[in-house]
Amino acid sequence: ALHHAKKYKRPVHLMGLLTDVQSAHANPKHLYALLDFFRKEEQKEVYLHLFTDGRDSPPHSAVKFLRDLRSNMKNGEKIATIMGRFYAMDRAKLWERTESAYHAMVFGMGHCTATSAEEAISEAYNRGETDEYICPTVISENKKPVATIGDNDAVYFFNARSDRARQITKAFVQSGFETLNG
């Protein structure tokens, strides 16, 4: 991902589950190591697309995990989207869920918008959503998405297991995603 980003002068997008060390799907230490790696390699544009847990962790624990993540963001990395794993980690071929996640990350079109990940979580809780079901939320600055995943950008999926990564990954790598859900 780094070689590609540097060669083509493109941003790096990290996407995966925001959870604690008890999860079978992701480990925050892996994400923190990636942030450290890209910082040491002087990669200037690093954007995060976070999937909140609430299934393998308590249903309102994303705020704590986000606080821990923020303490490891030291080089201008920005959170671009945040959403529940219900959308981004579906494996039941319920493509409308995947499409919602994809549209938030690629087109900056989320069901919800917020000016920070903290605001997104707070608003989700106010709507009665738990971490697993936080609607795909685009984080904006000056009424524009912080970042979207564009053509030729480098994308790194940091989940440890592949079973819940396949469907969203397919949306990124197979041409004509809109026809996949038919």
Give the location of each predicted region.
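…; additionally, a secondary subgroup of soluble metalloenzymes is captured
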Residues: 1-182
